[in-house]
């Protein structure tokens, strides 16, 4: 008998930084309130930029404080609030790169969300850099993510593509067993929900959920598509070292994907430990 449990809920107040674990949350149309509500703008190259272009962001962590303010911790342990007047200078110094921190702006402010200048004039080379793919490895199918070619995130959000990303403990365990020299720690993959699945022998159970509805607590999610992984999964984060072999294993063992994207079709409260049903 298939049994699915919501094991962990994670929120990431600042795009590309480590986040915080939640016991419960009220899911809205845009997913978890406060998730990816801040992002950094590259003041050297232009555009909102995450760790694909500024890898050191993944060494920082953030948690939500009062009133939606983000408390950011640098790798050296120092703290700064998103509302502090010196936040941009502080972040730029710690990142060793000029940036500014931005809250979400209205969706019609398209220039704010438009991608900055590419690092390469060769479009395929740029994509291979973003997705960490070698010349002999296939690029991911981006047909379901048309906005990502023009915008860093869907305008009005700082998500990569959809409000929620889900993964299973089984997928991480599968990759760990097949590639024991790399650490497939959930912190590399920044899922909002991590599920534990019992009663399935699927290597990557969540891939079978695409096109179906997931009922958890009072909420209902529509599982939209797989999550193609990018170079961020190879960067150092917390106590995990930089490891480009993570992408080699992902491509070989899982077509470069891990986890699935979801939309909220019914808003409601969810709690860690709840049993989940798939329709």
Question: What residue spans do the PLM features occupy?
Answer:
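Metal-cofactor-dependent catalytic cores
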Residues: 1-279
């Amino acid at each position: 008998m298939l049994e699915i449990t919501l094991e962990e809920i994670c929120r990431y107040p600042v795009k590309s930084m480590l986040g915080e674990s939640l016991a419960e949350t009220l899911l809205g149309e845009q997913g978890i309130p406060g998730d990816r509500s801040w992002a950094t703008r590259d003041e050297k190259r232009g555009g909102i930029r995450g760790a694909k272009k500024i890898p050191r962001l993944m060494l920082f962590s953030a948690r939500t404080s009062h009133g939606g303010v983000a408390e950011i911790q640098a790798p050296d342990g120092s703290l700064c609030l998103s509302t502090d007047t010196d936040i941009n200078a502080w972040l730029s110094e710690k990142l060793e790169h000029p940036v500014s921190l931005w809250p979400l702006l209205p969706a019609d402010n398209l220039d704010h969300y438009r991608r900055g200048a590419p690092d390469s004039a060769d479009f395929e080379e740029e994509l291979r850099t973003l997705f960490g793919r070698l010349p002999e490895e296939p690029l991911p199918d981006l047909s379901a993510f048309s906005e990502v070619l023009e915008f860093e995130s869907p305008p009005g959000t700082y998500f990569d593509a959809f409000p929620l990303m889900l993964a299973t403990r089984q997928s991480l365990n599968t990759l760990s067993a097949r590639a024991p020299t790399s650490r497939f720690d959930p912190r590399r993959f920044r899922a909002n929900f991590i599920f534990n699945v019992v009663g399935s022998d699927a290597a990557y159970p969540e891939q079978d959920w695409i096109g179906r509805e997931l009922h958890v607590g009072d909420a209902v999610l529509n599982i939209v598509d797989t999550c193609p992984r990018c170079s961020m999964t190879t960067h150092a984060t917390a106590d995990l070292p930089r490891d480009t072999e993570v992408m080699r294993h992902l491509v070989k063992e899982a077509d470069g994907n891990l986890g699935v994207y979801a939309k909220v079709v019914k808003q409601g409260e969810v709690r860690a430990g709840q049993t989940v049903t798939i329709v």
